[in-house]
Design a protein with these regions (language model features):
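Conserved N-terminal entry element of GNAT/NAT acetyltransferase domains
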Residues: 1-54
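Broad hydrophobic/π-residue packing in well-ordered secondary structure
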Residues: 4-6, 14, 84, 95-98
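Short amphipathic alpha-helical surface micro-motifs
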Residues: 13-16, 65-67, 108-113
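Intrinsically disordered, low-complexity regions enriched in small/polar residues
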Residues: 19, 23, 34-38, 42, ...
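Active-site rim helix/loop that mediates acceptor-substrate recognition in acyltransferases
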Residues: 34-82
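Conserved acyl-donor/pantetheine-binding loop and adjacent beta-alpha core of acyl/acetyltransferases
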Residues: 70-81, 87, 91-114
């Protein structure tokens, strides 16, 4: 068995990140494809802007994928997606999203007093 290496995502690993998501992350035919693990770190307004951009690209799965990918590229370059890539030799084979709790807009909600 090959040794697995774990590396924190950084802009210099952008190519590996997208190679993983474009070619291996959903090779099982998952209904979640396309995904770049970025929507969790986006506000509702940012997601709506991404949807609008997808419509400008012609809509459908291709418009959505292009908009989603462009948004993810920008987020990786600015350090807004944080996590770890797993490598088998030089090939990215796994991903773990590990951002700050407050950056998971869909999950983090301040406690409400009842």
């Amino acid at each position: 068995m090959n040794e697995i290496t774990i590396k924190a995502l950084s802009p210099d690993l952008e190519k590996d990140y997208f190679d993983f998501f474009d070619n291996r992350a959903f090779s099982d035919g998952s209904p979640y494809y396309p995904c770049y693990c970025n929507a969790f770190n986006m506000s509702a307004g940012e997601i709506e802007a991404m949807r609008d951009q997808a419509k400008q690209y012609g809509g459908g799965i291709e418009g959505w994928k292009r908009s989603l990918r462009e948004t993810a590229v920008r987020m990786v370059r600015h350090g807004l997606i944080r996590g770890y890539l797993a490598f088998d030799n030089d090939l990215a084979v796994g991903w773990c999203n590990a951002n700050d709790r407050t950056n998971f807009y869909g999950f983090y909600r301040p406690c409400e007093i009842i």
